[in-house]
Regions:
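Non-catalytic interface/linker regions that flank or bridge core catalytic/transmembrane domains
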Residues: 1-62, 69-71, 77-431
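Alpha-helical phosphate/pyrophosphate-handling elements in metalloenzyme active cores
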Residues: 39-61, 204-219, 226, 432-474, ...
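Divalent metal-dependent catalytic cores for phosphoryl transfer on phosphate-bearing substrates
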Residues: 69-94, 219, 233, 434, ...
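Hydrophobic alpha-helical scaffolding
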Residues: 88, 139, 152-163, 184, ...
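Short, conserved secondary-structure transition motifs
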Residues: 114-124, 519-528, 719
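Regulatory modules associated with amino-acid/nitrogen control
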Residues: 237, 277-327, 400, 408, ...
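Proline-centered turn/helix-capping motifs that create local helix->coil transitions or kinks
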Residues: 409-416, 448-455, 529
């Protein structure tokens, strides 16, 4: 073909593709679009094939998605060019010319050129090739060659081997996506519960059912009519969505990125409500479709399993349940049984038999159907209530039972408030799972505390949980702690009301109701205290102890808090947070067990403990008496006994040095480093230090800023490596100790800070920066709270602005939650003057302006 003809054909093809998109956008018939798009490409390729006189020389075959006539706007075109035994020079040149022309038309093609024997070898070697050819379709050329190919495909297809290979492939893909489809930007093709999981059903179906089509799933009683119709509806939903996604992205994009979610919601005519954005409502439907796909994929792959064993074990204490393939299954005689009265019996039996790893497909379908029939009569039935609580009180498979229940929509049907948060995403810059998935992750984390083989993860939590008398209380607290998300208002208070209703309905003991209610109301208190306040201050511990009241509340809240934070995102939890929570638990427990010690007594004990540590280094009290007197009494409120001992060892011979003293050490928990700064007090110490740590790639997790009675700054910084890497710590420590002295002594102004770009997530959700300033009691100290999206350079920028306003920082607690920063500072105006409201408002506006 001459260049002019190619350009004309390319223009014609582009126009036809555009018309197909226009028709789709008008009618929203994705199935027709995919077929028509495939047929358009069929005609185009056949025309090229014919013009190059390849018709009698080789066979052109469509494979994969193109083979099953599901060609999306920007999908690759998979082709097999089947040749006779070998390629001669003329045929090779023609095929090369054909592929070149296809690319010239702007089509994205993936192709292979093979003869029958080569294809047979590839089918046996690679299950991906076998799968692609399972959906092959003749386009043009030698039909005899194509018939031979179909014969080879059928001869080499061993259903059992194919099934095992595809299951392994699916498991690997799910692992790649962290076993969760409920993340913020799911891949609607590859993520668990996406189109690939629907295609898996077709591939396995084709391998074991002759002339398989989806309608046979209903005809052969693999699915009832209702589930079959929902399967078809879900398939259409995903296909329409993927077409739209390609259109707005203008490329082969299968991830529902934040940038596209609102655009898609607009195209699909979602409307915002009082408490939900249109994109959130759209994503809720996406997650519901994912949820159903995950469920139906499991059901049908179990039903279509060609290597299913006929071995059945009867269960003595149940006349309608059997064990088959290590699944708990419904006896075929009771296939049409009304299982609603026995829903919870199923899970009690599942927990009882250790060899059971899941439920059988027929039982799953029955449970899914029964979920729709749960009503108030069922919920008020004392027998059913006792069974549900029995499942939670079991020592076996609590997490697995609840996950299967949720898969079958049973939890949301039994606890309607839970049903409202199923598939609901949390757009708060740190939760990456839907609310129901997060809640189940919390329960899974609680269950991990019980396992001896996982004791190394959290030894203290393991010991506390093993000795915890009523574990079901913690599971119920986890179920309800976020149950009121998305309603507007304080979800902790609203969730507590849901607990009261559930407790009243289920006749929970008053003690259990009171503890669960308190845990739901207070589930954020411990993390807030640990991450925002100074735990070395006895007054902070005293205030927290007043809130928790007793050891039972403290232990319960500690276990729930650790499990909760770990369930938000893999990026939120770290050893720093673990240490903060552990220390708060330890200090508060000590306070509760010792009784109400006065602040003076607490400080006296702290001095005694520090002195004992120093004594092990042969440092007597007369060595550091002057140093401690110069530090003043407030110093002992600021630092722990271990920190006091360390600092005293370093400084007792340097009470008033002329040059800054910098010392660095590893943190005791093994994560991060501590940097001590001791020098004559001047302005901008904190600011210069922030800039230095930014430059060397360390983020400040916490800072204690203290001024001694003889006007020396004694500051302690806890640092985390922003980009963990292998380093020589000895060299790093020497570098910091030398370089930071120079920075602090220089009179040069620090370079203006430039914030890094916002993350896509923060940009999409337009997270509003929140800043508040409140006076601490009647003192000249003010608490500054800043909540914003986290970016490199943020702390330096805040410090720059505070320096300009003659405001000094006495304490900083830096809390990073995924992409969100929640930073708390204790600050003082110059000369400890009090700030009036105008000054406070003005400072808030200036900080917002520089952070924005």
């Amino acid at each position: 073909m001459i260049q002019k003809e190619i350009l004309s054909l390319k223009k014609e093809l582009a126009l036809n593709e555009l018309n197909l998109i226009k028709v789709f956008l008008k009618k929203r018939d994705g199935i027709s679009y995919l077929q028509n798009h495939s047929q358009l490409i069929d005609k185009t390729l056949s025309r090229l094939w014919h013009d190059l006189e390849l018709r009698n020389s080789a066979t052109l075959i469509a494979c994969g998605g193109y083979g099953r006539q599901e060609l999306f706007p920007y999908s690759d075109i998979d082709l097999l060019i089947l040749i006779p035994k070998s390629l001669n020079k003329s045929l090779s040149q023609k095929i090369e010319q054909f592929i070149s022309l296809v690319w010239d038309l702007g089509l994205r093609v993936g192709h292979s050129v093979r003869n029958i024997n080569q294809t047979k070898i590839e089918i046996k070697r690679d299950i991906t090739v076998q799968t692609n050819l399972l959906e092959s379709r003749y386009l043009n050329g030698d039909k005899v060659l194509y018939k031979n190919l179909k014969k080879i495909i059928n001869e080499t297809l061993i259903p059992a081997k194919f099934y095992q290979g595809k299951i392994k492939e699916q498991d690997h893909r799910h692992q790649k996506y962290n076993q969760s489809a409920y993340q913020l930007e799911p891949n609607i093709k590859e993520s668990p519960g996406g189109l690939r999981d629907l295609q898996m059903i077709q591939w396995v179906g084709k391998s074991c059912i002759k002339r398989f089509t989806p309608t046979k799933l209903n005809q052969k009683k693999y699915l009832d009519k209702k589930n079959y119709q929902k399967l078809i509806k879900t398939d259409i939903f995903f296909k329409n969505l993927r077409i739209l996604l390609h259109v707005i992205a203008k490329q082969n994009e299968d991830r529902l990125l934040f940038d596209y979610q609102n655009k898609l919601a607009l195209l699909l005519k979602y409307k915002k409500t009082t408490h939900s954005k249109r994109s959130e409502l759209f994503m809720k439907d996406v997650y519901e479709a994912i949820n159903f796909t995950t469920f139906i994929n499991e059901v049908l792959l179990k039903k279509l399993n060609p290597i299913e064993s006929d071995k059945i074990t009867k269960i003595t204490d149940s006349h309608f349940l059997i064990i088959k393939n290590n699944y708990l299954e419904i006896n075929s005689k009771f296939q049409n049984k009304n299982i609603k009265p026995y829903i919870f019996d199923v899970f009690m039996t599942f927990q009882k038999y250790k060899q059971l790893n899941s439920l059988g497909p027929n039982l799953l379908l029955l449970l899914g159907s029964a979920a729709n029939r749960i009503n108030d009569t069922f919920r008020k039935d004392k027998n059913q209530q006792a069974k549900f609580l029995s499942i939670l009180k079991s020592n076996e498979k609590v997490n697995r039972s609840l996950r299967i229940m949720n898969k079958c929509n049973l939890i949301g049907s039994y606890i309607p408030a839970f049903g409202k948060i199923v598939s609901q995403m949390q757009h708060d810059l740190f939760h990456i799972y839907t609310v129901d998935e997060h809640i189940l992750n919390v329960i899974q984390n609680l269950r991990r505390f019980a396992k001896d083989e996982l004791k190394h993860e959290f030894p203290d939590c393991h010991d506390l949980f093993k000795n915890y008398p009523h574990k079901h209380i913690l599971y119920l607290a986890a179920l309800f702690h976020d149950i009121a998300k998305g309603r507007g208002g304080d979800h902790s208070e609203l969730g507590a009301k849901d607990v009261h209703e559930f407790s009243k309905l289920n006749h929970l003991p008053s003690h259990d109701e009171a503890l669960i209610t308190w845990l739901v109301k207070s589930h954020l208190v411990m993390s807030h205290t640990a991450q925002k306040l100074d735990l070395s201050d006895p007054r902070v511990i005293e205030e927290f102890a007043r809130k928790v009241v007793n050891k039972e509340n403290l232990t319960s809240l500690y276990l729930l808090t650790v499990a909760d934070i770990r369930a938000t995102s893999p990026h939120v939890w770290n050893q720093w947070k673990a240490t903060l929570l552990k220390n708060l638990f330890k200090y508060t427990l000590n306070y509760l067990e010792q009784g109400n010690l006065s602040h003076e007594d607490s400080i006296a004990k702290r001095k005694e403990k520090a002195a004992l540590i120093l004594n092990t280094y042969n440092i007597r009290d007369d060595h550091y008496k002057d140093l401690w007197e110069n530090f003043g009494e407030n110093y002992f409120y600021k630092y722990t006994e271990e920190e006091i001992a360390w600092q005293t060892r370093l400084l007792f011979t340097h009470t008033a040095p002329k040059k800054p003293i910098i010392r660095v050490r590893h943190r005791s928990n093994g994560e991060g480093i501590e940097v001590l700064i001791y020098q004559k007090n001047t302005m901008h110490i904190f600011n210069k230090t922030c800039h230095f740590f930014d430059e060397i790639g360390y983020s400040i997790a916490a800072a204690k800023i203290f001024t001694t009675q003889h006007n020396y700054a004694l500051n302690l910084f806890d640092l985390l490596d922003a980009n963990p890497k292998s380093v020589s710590y000895e060299g790093l420590f020497k570098f910091i100790e030398k370089e930071l002295v120079g920075r602090l002594e220089t009179s040069k102004e620090t370079k203006p800070t430039k914030l890094s770009e916002r993350s896509r997530q923060a940009t999409h959700f337009a997270f509003d920066t929140k800043i508040s300033i409140a006076q601490v009691d009647e003192s000249p100290i003010y608490q500054l709270d800043i909540i914003t999206d986290d970016r490199n350079g943020l702390l330096s920028l805040i410090s720059d602005q505070l320096s300009k306003e003659n405001i000094s920082i006495n304490q900083a607690k830096i809390n990073t939650l995924g992409s969100r920063a929640e930073d708390t500072f204790l600050v003082a105006y110059k000369n400890n003057l009090k700030m009036n409201q105008n000054k406070i408002d003005n400072l808030v506006e200036k900080l917002k302006a520089v952070i924005a």
